[in-house]
Regions:
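NAD(P)H-binding glycine-rich loop region in Rossmannoid oxidoreductase-like domains
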Residues: 4-44
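Active-site Tyr-X1-5-Lys
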Residues: 74, 87-111
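Conserved Rossmann-fold NAD(P)-dependent oxidoreductase catalytic core, especially the SDR/UDP-sugar
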Residues: 50-89
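C-terminal amphipathic/interface module of NAD(P)-dependent oxidoreductases
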Residues: 197, 212-246
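NAD(P)-dependent short-chain dehydrogenase/reductase
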Residues: 101-148, 154-155, 161
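SDR active-site strand-loop-helix element
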Residues: 22-26, 63-69, 113-115
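Glycine-rich NAD(P)-binding loop of the Rossmann-fold in SDR/ketoreductase-type enzymes
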Residues: 5, 36, 40-51, 86, ...
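Mid/C-terminal beta-alpha module of Rossmann-like enzyme folds, strongest
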Residues: 136, 159, 166-210, 238-239, ...
Length: 246
């Protein structure tokens, strides 16, 4: 492990390991905290990416940057394609825009992967959190005013690994097909496990966490690889959770 904000450490690592390709996942991801310490967020996400770009160039490796739907300061009901102009709505989004700019300016053998609203079988993740809350409550109150494209981390990882083995460089939106709000995601989760807990949709996501957040973070997948429907992905995620419990 090394600190991506330390350019010398990054160059030392890639020089020693000599990878053919680098998937750059290290990031500052706390949207709320980023508003109170913007310099740190930008240092990790923007400068850290610049350091990894320079390290990749030093050994001739191709690089894949994990970016985010937060690069768009979207108006309601806008679905963003890969060619749309970025316009960050918060500090985290700005840091990712700057990271993308560093990659595009200096590298031709690169991939920029945007995604968002990730879910997984992780014990502290969104899905396990919904299931745990449903065990303790008869009703959950969850926001219905943020539209997104829920994406299973396992599907995302497989697509990224497949993509980086190619020479099809460019910007990609890797998301599970379909869209929903957070309340619908929770309803689907509880329905698939047969829970009697009810979900009460409520408005109020925007502004409730102290940051400017777009009302729509939907992305359009313009090119392969295309990921399965989010409902199918959620069902497989729940299967993974069940298998880990046994």
């Amino acid at each position: 492990d090394f600190d991506v904000t330390d350019g010398a450490a990054g160059r030392e690592w890639v020089t020693a390991e000599k990878p053919d390709a680098i998937i750059h996942l290290a990031a500052y991801t706390d949207l709320l905290k980023a508003e109170t310490e913007p310099a740190k967020c930008i240092d990790v996400n923007a400068m850290g990416t610049l350091n990894m770009v320079r390290a990749a160039l030093a050994i001739g490796a191709k690089l894949m940057l994990m970016s985010s739907s937060e690069v768009f300061g979207a108006a309601p009901d806008v679905i963003h394609g890969t060619r749309d102009k970025t316009c960050a709505a918060n500090v985290y989004g700005l840091s990712k825009v700057q990271a993308e700019e560093a990659v595009r300016a200096l590298m031709t053998r690169s991939f920029i992967v945007r995604t968002g609203c990730l879910f997984s079988a992780a014990p502290k993740g969104e899905i396990c959190g919904i299931l745990a809350s449903a065990q303790d409550h008869q009703k959950l109150t969850i926001s219905d005013d943020l539209m997104a494209c829920p994406t299973y981390t396992l599907d995302l990882a497989r697509a990224m690994v497949s993509l980086i083995q190619t020479e099809k460089f460019g910007i990609y939106h890797l998301i599970n097909e379909g869209e929903c709000n957070l309340a619908t995601l929770a309803m689907a989760t509880l329905g698939m496990v047969g829970s009697r807990c009810r979900v009460q949709p409520v408005s109020g996501y925007r502004g409730s966490v102290g940051i400017h957040h777009p009302s729509s973070v939907r992305l359009q997948s313009d090119a392969e690889p295309h990921l399965p429907r989010w409902e199918d992905a959620l069902n497989r995620c729940l299967d993974e959770i069940r298998s880990e419990i046994r």
